[in-house]
Curated annotation (Swiss-Prot):
Residues 260-339 form a coiled coil. This is Coiled-coil domain-containing protein 138. The modification Phosphoserine is found at residues 64, 484. The modification Phosphothreonine is found at residue 63. It comes from Mus musculus (Mouse). Residues 390-410 are annotated as: Disordered.
Length: 680
């Protein structure tokens, strides 16, 4: 059994095969004198092969793909490729070192050559098995060429195989068999050297291919290293971003927790506020129920009062009927008395013939006690019914609730019927005691005030004008008759004065009646002058408030009465003087009628400066009442005052001071050094 060559660790199969084939596998002890002949023979053969054309073998290597596949797919070369690449550049030293251990035993016998050839074929089969185990096969064409070459050098290859196999199998074999001397004539054939070169060239090509592959692999490694560096940098950036995101996440969670706590706190506050609102709603509901009960009670009381009022009206009608009956009875008794007196009857007839109103004064002279009774009734009616004048806009002054429209209409109808009769009765007043004039005039005044909002006063224009003239001028009567004397009547002129009376209450009432009924400018001017004089006294101010004279005055506070405008303002200005009547007067002016009149007046372009200054004093005092701020805003008086303040020349310091004070009281401007309180 043939011994196989054992490869050292890291050796390539092809290199081992060459070493085992050409005797390079082990060290064979050869003497120096034997190697001298071998070396000389090798040098001669190398010189003879120097001119050998290697192009043929290179072309065969290139055109033989099986051979390239064999060496390219063979085992990896460890340390031997470097050795053979050096041998390619310097071919002489490897051959010398290889053949130091070569034992050439040439036999001339032909049979030994064939025997050795048979061994070489056996060895070739073993080597093919080795190549199959290493995953690289030699093509059939290569083995055929090698077999052809082996036939030419069968002797040399057989000897080399024996020598190498012996040296590899056992080093003791060399000692048993003596080394035969090498014949100087025996040497290596050129074909074997070419085959060695061919093998070395294949190794060289394989090394170059591996070098190129390693360079490419190195470049790929460099690129991959660069790619990994970029990925590492990207990973670092991602890690940094993740750390930032982690910090942001913690901050967001903290902020979310804070917001959650704030939300919970707000919910608690809102819940408490809702509970308070619910409690307040319950209280308001209970208050509303209470108010509703009170309203029901008031409605019941109103119904009761209405029933009582109806009863009082029925009673008043009965009293009026009784009064009429008494008057008829008195007239009947007077007529009976006149029938008993012939002289009186003759005078009555003569008076009828002359169509003179003699019976009236005659009647008046005889009815003094009746007039006293009538004045009592007039005072009672005036105080209980007529003096309760309804405002033109109900509910503005915040006073008592207005009467029913039907009741007010009834009162106005009665006043319309009474005024013509009262105007006729003025002609008797000279025959009546002066103390009865005031109740009579008061009754006329309150009857006129009841007609302020009536639409029928236009139909009574002539009656009102006559009434005003009689009150202004007075009434004079010449013929009188004294009932107490039973002798002839003496003619004596008597006069009843009202407007020019020395009694302040009568004069004040007469002035108001003149202002209410007269349209002549000269009469009105005298009436306002008299009113201003009367208002300088405390009694006059008291009467002004008692008779509610503001609506009468406001009817003349308009631009159409341009000549009387200053007198009207003066009369109102007298009421603004510091006194006990100032505050009631300001409260009486705190209504929509007064503010509407002032608003219309302030809108007048180019209003006289003196009138504006006087009006500003009144408005300044009214602005001190907080409840009047709404009236200032409703009628936009505050805006007009601001515009007047903006356009007023600084030289008019008095007006500027009043305007600034008024606006300051309304909270529309800041206090400055110019604002001072006026005492006018």
């Amino acid at each position: 059994m043939e011994r196989r060559v054992v490869k050292p660790p890291g050796q390539d199969m092809v290199v081992e095969r060459l070493k085992s084939r050409y005797g390079l596998a082990g060290r064979c002890p050869v003497e120096e004198n034997d190697m001298t002949g071998v070396w000389a023979a090798l040098m001669n053969q190398q010189h003879e092969l120097s001119d050998f054309d290697q192009t043929k073998y290179k072309r065969r290597i290139v055109t033989s793909p099986d051979g390239l596949d064999t060496y390219s797919s063979g085992d990896k070369v460890g340390s031997s490729p470097r050795y053979y690449s050096d041998g390619r550049n310097h071919p002489t030293p490897p051959f010398c070192s290889s053949f130091k251990h070569l034992n050439v035993n040439c036999l001339d016998d032909e049979l030994d050559s064939f025997h050795d050839l048979k061994k070489w074929e056996t060895e070739k089969e073993l080597m093919e098995d080795d190549h199959r185990d290493g995953a690289s096969k030699i093509t059939k064409q290569s083995f055929k060429e090698m077999e052809t070459d082996a036939l030419m050098t069968s002797m040399a290859s057989g000897l080399e195989t024996e020598c190498c196999s012996g040296s590899i199998d056992s080093p003791l074999k060399q000692a048993v068999y003596p080394r035969p001397k090498v014949s100087k004539k025996q040497g290596l054939l050129p074909h074997e050297i070419n085959q060695i070169y061919d093998e070395l060239y294949h190794i060289h090509m394989k090394l170059q291919y591996e070098t190129t592959a390693q360079k490419k692999f190195a470049e790929e490694l460099q690129k991959r290293e660069q790619f990994l560096a970029e990925r590492e940098q990207l990973l670092f950036s991602h890690e940094t971003a993740l750390s930032k995101i982690k910090g942001v996440k913690e901050e967001v969670l903290t902020r979310f927790q804070i917001l959650k706590e704030q939300h919970g706190t707000e919910i608690e506050h809102l819940t408490e506020a809702l509970k308070e609102k619910n409690k307040e709603n319950k209280r308001m509901r209970s208050s509303f129920d209470t108010l509703r009960e009170l309203n029901d009670n008031l409605r019941k009381q109103l119904n009761e009062v209405s029933e009582e009022n109806k009863k009082m009206e029925i009673q008043a009608k009965r009293v009026q009927a009784r009064l009429d009956n008494l008057q008829r009875k008195y007239e009947f008794m007077t007529v009976q008395r006149l029938k008993g007196d012939s002289h009186a009857a003759h005078e009555v007839k003569s008076s009828k013939q002359e169509k003179a109103p003699a019976p009236k004064p005659f009647k008046a002279a005889l009815n003094g006690q009746v007039y006293e009774l009538l004045t009592v009734f007039m005072d009672w009616i005036s105080d209980c019914h007529l003096s309760k004048v309804e405002p033109e806009e109900p509910g503005v002054d915040g006073g008592k609730p207005p009467a029913k429209p039907s009741q007010r209409s009834d009162i106005q109808e009665k006043c319309v019927k009474l005024l013509p009769m009262m105007t006729e009765q003025l002609q008797w007043m000279p025959l009546v005691s002066a103390k009865l004039h005031e109740p009579f005039v008061r009754f006329i005044y309150w009857s006129l005030r009841q007609l302020d909002a009536s639409a029928r006063q236009s139909t009574m224009a002539s009656t009102l004008r006559r009434l005003g003239e009689d009150v202004f001028k007075g009434v004079t009567m010449k013929g009188t008759q004294d009932n107490s004397l039973e002798h002839s009547v003496e003619n004596k002129a008597k006069t009843a004065v009202f407007f020019k009376s020395s009694s302040l209450p009568l004069r004040f009432l007469s002035t108001l009646i003149v202002l209410r009924t007269v349209t002549q400018a000269d009469y009105l001017a005298q009436a306002f002058d008299s009113l201003c004089l009367d208002l300088k006294t405390d009694e006059g101010k008291t009467l002004f408030l008692e008779y509610q004279a503001i609506p009468v005055i406001l009817k003349h506070l308009r631009i159409s009465s341009k000549g009387l405008l200053s007198n009207v303002i003066d009369s109102l200005l007298q009421m603004t003087v510091e006194s006990k009547s100032l505050q009631p007067f300001l409260e009486a002016c705190s209504n929509s009628l007064f503010f509407r009149t002032c608003s219309v007046l302030l809108r007048t372009p180019k209003l006289d400066l003196h009138i504006l200054e006087k009006l500003s004093i009144i408005l300044q005092k009214l602005s001190k009442i907080k409840s009047n701020k709404k009236l200032f805003e409703v009628f936009t008086i505050h805006l007009m005052l601001q515009e007047i303040q903006r356009t007023t020349h600084p030289e008019h310091a008095f007006l500027c001071i009043n305007l600034n004070s008024t606006l300051f009281n309304l909270g529309l401007t800041k206090c400055n050094s110019l604002v001072t309180s006026t005492s006018h």
